[in-house]
Amino acid sequence: MKLFVLIALFGLGFAQHNPNTRDGRTAIVHLFEWRWADIAAECERFLGPKGFAGVQISPPNEHILVSSPWRPWWQRYQPISYNLCSRSGGENELRDMITRCNNVGVNVYVDAVINHMCGAGGGEGTHSSCGSWFNANNKDFPSVPYSNLDFNDGKCKTGSGNIENYGDPYQVRDCRLVGLLDLALEKDYVRGKVADFMNKLIDMGVAGFRVDACKHMWPGDLDNVYRRLNNLNTKWFPGGSRPFIFQEVIDLGGEPITTGEYVGLGRVTEFKYGARLGELFRKWNGQKLSYTKNWGEGWGFMADGNAVVFTDNHDNQRGHGAGGASILTFWDPRLYKMAVGYMLAHPYGFTRVMSSYSWDRNFVNGKDENDWIGPPSNGDGSTKPVPINPDQTCGDGWVCEHRWRQIMNMVQFRNVVNGQPHANWWDNGNNQVAFGRGNRGFIVFNNDDWALDVTLNTGLPGGTYCDVISGNKDGGSCTGKQITVGGDGRAHFYINNSEEDPFIAIHADSKL
């Protein structure tokens, strides 16, 4: 019996590590703060045809409306209820988007905020995205309903009621994260309300969840909630499929709470990945790309099958969260494209690409005073649509990194080489490196201050290939560089260090 229970335990967690992607698709994109109507259109016109596996959406539940500062992005992370009406749209628009994305093979992953409700200073009234009344002062949220009995205040031992010391795991789990009212997830009633919210989304067709702030919840409480979740909707997924769970746990080392406590329940965000990747491409702290021959677990990251990896996310591109100044973002486009290219070419982890909006940064003593600014919006605070320009970029302040040719084409590269081993490594001892993926793909980087000029074994069949970084394969022709691979698998590469994009990628489907 014990053995059976162990297998059942392990089996459930293991199933929750599976992203349930379709048709050999391998990378998801976070369309941060996009409206549901725009995501639905993007699935149909771009994400589906271009081979993206899925989209991570911003929290869909009712949230507080903050006036000072004006409608910041982080108001989405302060729930008022589990009603499905948010800054991105209402329940009907959400359902329509989930259906339309699923119909073109693109999964939807929900950012689930279940650790807390709004901030203790959230006040009383109907300043919420659906107009529900609430009173944060006495912890009254009748639209759930939650009352003061459903929060952790009695368990928290700090004077302020907030987390004061990250060295104390009890504080981190039982006290308020930056003043946010901390739900008592040990209570059966609260667990039930959270599971009902998640199950409604599963029944609508979502494929899984990014679970926010998991470090601040006890693993046993999360396990209980996950066990209550329904299997995925069989209209789009095989019978018995479990929701994909990936948990936000910031663990850069140095704290008692580690990712290891959560990997049995689902995948976990590997924040070390983007922090190290940024250092490597910036060449900080003596780092060199030549040191990445054993990139992945060899660098002290969690096991491959447990990791969700990303260059940047919505927090750390603003200096919040983890990684500090080393994090590469769209503000550093040349290095950013290389770093994302490296991530998408390398077999380690399940990959997430960021899609951002720009804002007017204002650095004072190294801190961006405008890191709160919400998405492009109208005077009334409503989020603007995402317009697509004739050149396929986005307008109105939406950055759309996922549409940049170099990133879009590397998502396709990852699909083409899926399942192939890391092979044919080469480096120059500095910041020129190359590696292949079996006999399906090969990529070369020059991050040195001098030209790369070398003949390498690619492992690819002989022929002429289109470099998908400098251009696109268009029928039988190529709009970028062409690379000739000999019958022996060898090819000559030249990359000047002054090029806009000093890297080259070729793969089986880019053969002319």
Swiss-Prot record:
The record marks D315 as: Transition state stabilizer. Ca(2+) binds at N115, R173, D182, H216. Optimum temperature is 50 degrees Celsius. GO terms for cellular component: extracellular space. Pfam families: Alpha-amylase (PF00128), Alpha-amylase_C (PF02806). Its main location: secreted. Belongs to the glycosyl hydrolase 13 family. This is Alpha-amylase. SMART domains: Aamy (SM00642), Aamy_C (SM00632). Glycans are attached at N496. InterPro entries: A-amylase/branching_C (IPR006048), A-amylase_C (IPR031319), Alpha_amylase (IPR006046), Glyco_hydro_13_cat_dom (IPR006047), Glyco_hydro_b (IPR013780), Glycoside_hydrolase_SF (IPR017853). Keywords: Calcium, Carbohydrate metabolism, Chloride, Disulfide bond, Glycoprotein, Glycosidase, Hydrolase, Metal-binding, Secreted, Signal. SUPFAM superfamilies: (Trans)glycosidases, Glycosyl hydrolase domain. It is found in: Secreted. Its cofactor is Ca(2+); chloride. It is an enzyme of class 3 (hydrolase). Chloride binds at R210, R352. Residues 1-15 form the signal peptide. Binds 1 Ca(2+) ion per subunit. Binds 1 Cl(-) ion per subunit. Catalyzes the hydrolysis of alpha-1,4 glycosidic linkages in starch, glycogen and similar oligosaccharides. It catalyses: Endohydrolysis of (1->4)-alpha-D-glucosidic linkages in polysaccharides containing three or more (1->4)-alpha-linked D-glucose units. The keyword Signal applies. PANTHER family: ALPHA-AMYLASE. Its EC number is 3.2.1.1. The active site is at D212 (nucleophile), E248 (proton donor). Disulfide bonds join C43-C101, C85-C130, C156-C175, C394-C400, C466-C478.
